[in-house]
Amino acid sequence: MAPKTLYEKIFDSHLVHEEADGTCLIYIDRHLVHEVTSPQAFEGLRNANRKVRRTDCTLATVDHNIPTASRKSYRDTKSFVEQVDSRTQCMTLEENVKAFGLTFFGLSDNRQGIVHIIGPEQGFTLPGATIVCGDSHTSTHGAFGALAFGIGTSEVEHVLATQTLLQKRAKNMLIQVDGELSQGVTSKDIILHIIGLIGTAGGTGHVIEYAGSTIRSLSMEARMSICNMSIEAGARAGLIAPDEITYEYIKGRPLAPKQGEAWDQALAYWKTLPSDEGAQYDTVIKIDAKDIPPTVTWGTSPQDVVAITGTVPDPKNASNEAEAKAWTRALEYMGLEAGTPMEKIKIDKVFIGSCTNARIEDLRAAARVLHGRKVADGLYCMLVPGSGLVKKQAEAEGLDKIFQAAGFDWREAGCSMCLGMNPDQLAPGERCASTSNRNFEGRQGAGGRTHLMSPAMAAACAVTGYLTDVRKVVGHSSAKVGSDAAKPAFEIEVSDAKSYLVDATPAPAPTNVAAAGAGALTDEDALRDVPASHISSSGGGMEKFTTLTGIAAPLERSNVDTDLIIPKQFLKTIKRTGLGSALFWPLRYDAKTGEPDPAFVLNQKPYDQSKILVVTGPNFGCGSSREHAAWSLLDFGIRAVIAESFGDIFRNNLTKNGQLPVVLSRAQIQRLTQDAKAGKQITVDLVDQLVITADGKEKFSFETPEFTRHCLINGLDDIALTLQRDAQIGAFERNRSTHTPWLDGFGYHANSNSSSLLDSAKPLVNNVTATDW
C-alpha cells in the first residue's frame, strides 16, 4: 500500500461513496452549529419534513452576535439581547434546538462560548474525526489531527439531514517549521508569517499539514491558533498530527473516550494517523523558526504583514501592477503613509479575544505583560474570553483582576469585535490592535482599521497606545519601555482547565418537528409577525442552469473577500432572500450619505441588469463561509461569476444555489473584460462548458466536476440525491460503531439513526442540564 498523508488517511476512512468524476460522499463525525448560518438550514429541514440524522454528533451554541456585556441580571434571551435582528437569530436557534432535539449551550450555561473553543474544551473534537461548522474557522480543530473545515448554510442543512457531505479530494501541502522561536515570537506570529509568505491564495485547493520541531513543541492552544488561520492562507483545512501533547489535552474531557478500554482503543487508533514516511505532498514549504519575527499586519488582507520593527511598505516596491494597486488602496483605507515605522502608528482600541486567541494561555500571556501596568490614556481595551469556562478559570487565577487593574473591560464570552456583529465595534476611522483573524475593510466595524497580532503584543500596545514590539515591554530589549524594578513579580496559581468541566449528558428529546409542517412559521416567526410568504423556501431543488446569455459586469479587483461582497450587518437574517440591495455594500454606497455611488459598476446602466460578473483578479470570495454572499449575488440577478480562482467555501456555496463559478486564465478574462466594459452580452454555456465572446468568434473552455454539472443542469436537490444512498450511509454508520465506537454519542443505537435519550438529564453547573434554553 502506498504511503499516505494524515489528510489522506482521514479522508479515505470516511468515504461512503465516490462518483466516477471523483466527487466523494464522506461521513461527518462532528457538527457544530451557531445562530448565524443555521436558521435557513433548519427551515429547509422543516420544508422537506426531514429530521436531524445524528443529534448525538451535533452541538449548538450562540456566539456570533450575542452581547458580551455582564450577564449578572440575565433572565432570558428575549430580554437580554437588545438588537432585534440578533435577538431573532438567537431565539430562532433556541426554537430549532428544541424542535430537533440538539444539545445546546445557551447564555446561562458556563459551557457557552465560541464554537471553536467549546468543541475542543468539551472533548467533542477528536483526532481522526471529520468536523464541520457553518464558519470558516472550523479549521481550528485540525490542531487535533482532525479534518475540520467550514461549510455554507446549504451544506449545514445537508449534514443535518444526512450526516454526510459531497467533497472533492484536496491537494496536500506540507509546511515544516523547524528550530527554536526567538523571544517574543508566538504561534500567532508563525501563522501570520506563513500567510505573508504564501499569500491568501497560496493554499487554495490544498489541505495544509503543519509539521517540524517548532510545531511539535507547541501547546494545543498554540496549535489551534495556527490551524485557525489556515483559511486565511486559502486552504480548505489545516492539520497537525496528534501526539502525546494532544492525548494529554483530550484525556478526561466530558465527550472524550472514557478511561479504560474505550480510551485504549481510541489511543491505539489515533497513533496510526500521522503521515507515513515517504508520503507525497503536492507542495512543500520549509521555514526556519529563527526567521520569524514578532509580526503585525499593516493593510486590509492577512497577507499584508511586516515585522513590528519594520515600516509600512511602499507600493513602488510591489512585485506587479495589481499588487501596487492593492497596496495603494489598502494604505488609503488604513490611513497610513508608506515608510512609516510600524511602532509610530497610534491606536484607539485593543481587542483581545476571538476563536484565534481567547483561550486561557492567551489570557495568561496578555496578563503577564499587563501585570502592574496601566492602559495608555484615552485608549479603550476589551478582553473577551472564548467561553464561560475560560472566563471562570481566568477569574479563579486572578487574571480578571490584572486586566481590570490595568484598565481593560472584562467581558462575557462571544465572538465580539472579531467581526462586530454585536455592539462591540470600531467607529469609522478607529484603529485597533486585535488578536482576531481578519483585517478586511470594515471587518470590525464600518471604516474601522484592524492590525492583527498576538495577545502579548496587543497587551503591549495597550500599555503604550501605539503598535509596539512586545520585547520592549517585557524581555531583554535594550529599548525597554518602563521599568520592572518596582513591579511585584507576576505570580498566579495556574489551575487545571479540566477541573472546571462537568459531566456530559445525552441530547434532549426533540419536540414535534412534523407539526411545523412544510413552510410553516416557527414560534419566533409568529412572535415577530412574519408573513408566511416572506419565509424562504429551501430543500426543494433549484433553477436549472444550462446556458446563460447576458450583460457581464467587470470588477477589477483581487482578493475580493466575502465581507466586501456582503458586510456582517446583513447576515442577521433568517431568510435566504432580500439581500440583493446589500451586494457589495461598501462599494455601491457612499459611507456618509448611504446613497448609491455612481462610480461603482453595478450602479451604472446596463450593469444594473448584469447576469454575469467578470472578475479580473484571483481569489474571489475568500474569507468567511457566509452563504449570504452567494444569496446576495443571486438576488441581484448574477448567476455566473468568472475569475482566475475562488475561495473554496464560496465556490461550493455558489453551486448549492444554482450559480456557476467559472475559472479561466488571466488572458481569457482580459478578453472578456473588453466585452464587459463595452456593455456587450457574453454567453456561459454549461452544457458544452464554454464561455463565448459577444461576437461569437472566441470560445473559452472551462471545467466543472461532472456531478456538480449534472446537478446544476438538472436543478437537482443534492440532499435528496444523497438520501438515495441511505443504505450505504447506514452501513457506514454500523461499521463506524464497530471500529470507532468512541465517535458515537451517548445512547446512540447504530440501527436506529437516532439518539436514544434518557428520561432525565444529570444536573450540571448552575442548575443547567444537558441543554440550556
UniProtKB/Swiss-Prot annotation:
Keywords: 4Fe-4S, Amino-acid biosynthesis, Branched-chain amino acid biosynthesis, Iron, Iron-sulfur, Leucine biosynthesis, Lyase, Metal-binding. GO terms for cellular component: 3-isopropylmalate dehydratase complex. It catalyses: (2R,3S)-3-isopropylmalate = (2S)-2-isopropylmalate. Pathway: Amino-acid biosynthesis; L-leucine biosynthesis; L-leucine from 3-methyl-2-oxobutanoate: step 2/4. Its cofactor is [4Fe-4S] cluster. InterPro entries: 3-IsopropMal_deHydase_lsu, 3-IsopropMal_deHydase_ssu, 3-IsopropMal_deHydtase_ssu/lsu, Acnase/IPM_dHydase_lsu_aba_1/3, Acoase/IPM_deHydtase_lsu_aba, Aconitase/3IPM_dehydase_swvl, Aconitase_4Fe-4S_BS, Aconitase_4Fe-4S_dom. It comes from the Eukaryota. Its EC number is 4.2.1.33. The keyword rRNA processing does not apply. [4Fe-4S] cluster binds at C355, C415, C418. Belongs to the aconitase/IPM isomerase family. Monomer. Catalyzes the isomerization between 2-isopropylmalate and 3-isopropylmalate, via the formation of 2-isopropylmaleate. This is 3-isopropylmalate dehydratase.
